[in-house]
């Protein structure tokens, strides 16, 4: 399973992004990755940053537009973010 932290830098994300976030919490998590990739491609101006754990990225060959980080840094990222959706 790909573990992605979807960081919303804005307190009021767009409806489209909210819908994608809702879908990402559903049972088809691989599909949610594709939806998020598409959202970033179509709306590059949205305040979105997606992080993938390095070990998951290596195992699954995650697309290069995702930024991978070490697991140890994940807690700091969560604590410093306005809101985080995890799936």
Language model: regions and residue ranges:
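Short, charged/polar "capping" segments at the starts of alpha-helices
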Residues: 13-16, 39-44, 59-60
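Short, flexible loop segments at the rims of nucleotide/cofactor-binding pockets, characterized by
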Residues: 8-11, 32, 61-65
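Short internal beta-strands
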Residues: 30-38, 43, 49-56
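Active-site regions of enzymes building and remodeling cell-envelope glycoconjugates
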Residues: 46-58, 63-72
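Histidine-anchored nucleotide/phosphate-binding helix
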Residues: 11-36
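Extreme N-terminal starter segment of soluble prokaryotic enzymes
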Residues: 1-5
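C-terminal structural segments of small proteins and small subunits
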Residues: 64-87
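Structural motif
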Residues: 7-11, 36-38, 87
């Amino acid at each position: 399973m790909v573990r992605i932290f979807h960081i919303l830098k804005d307190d009021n994300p767009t409806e489209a992004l909210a819908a994608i976030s809702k879908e990402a919490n559903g049972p088809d998590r691989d599909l949610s990755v594709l939806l998020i990739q598409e959202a970033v491609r179509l709306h590059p101006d949205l305040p979105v940053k997606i992080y993938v754990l390095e070990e998951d990225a290596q195992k699954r060959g995650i697309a290069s537009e995702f930024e991978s980080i070490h697991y140890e840094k994940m807690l700091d990222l969560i604590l410093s973010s306005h809101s985080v959706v995890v799936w």
